[in-house]
Amino acid sequence: ASDEPALIVECLNGYRLKEQLPTNLGAFRTPIGKVETLVTGTDITIVSYGSTLRIIEDAIVDLERAGIAIELIDAQSLLPFDKDHDILKSVKKTSRLLVVDEDVPGGASAFILQQVLDEQHAWPYLDSKPQCLSAQPHRPAYGTDGDYFSKPSKDDVFDTVYKIMHESNPTTYPLFE
């Protein structure tokens, strides 16, 4: 417990998901400033948080079929951000970086990218341009398909990752037109 003020952001579309109740509910604590590696891989580091993690996990199944091994990292907190520089360690291993966020362009994904590139100095370890995949710069459409056309989808994640892989290895990952 702390007397320090805190802001917690909850993704509303996560409320609709059904999950098992954790057995350690009273004991579980998320350390502030620590990231969590959810999936280990060697080809590309994807950093995200909140409800987009499920979208990325769905895309990972298809990306693995395409021969791409994803390292998925949950940022968990922005201030402080990745105190142990675990994202930099991952980028050193994969040489590629994608930040996925359901917020508008220039939001949390831009902050995360700035922290990894400028504060953690990841530039020298990249084989391709680091990218952000965020929501479209418009108001979401109402209806059942509003999120699909406004926020990053499983298909968007797959396409973006595949293009990043193509950029550094076009022979192994040819573009399909």
Outline where the language-model segments fall.
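Thiamine diphosphate
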Residues: L12-E177
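Internal gly/pro-rich beta-alpha loop/helix module
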Residues: A1-E4
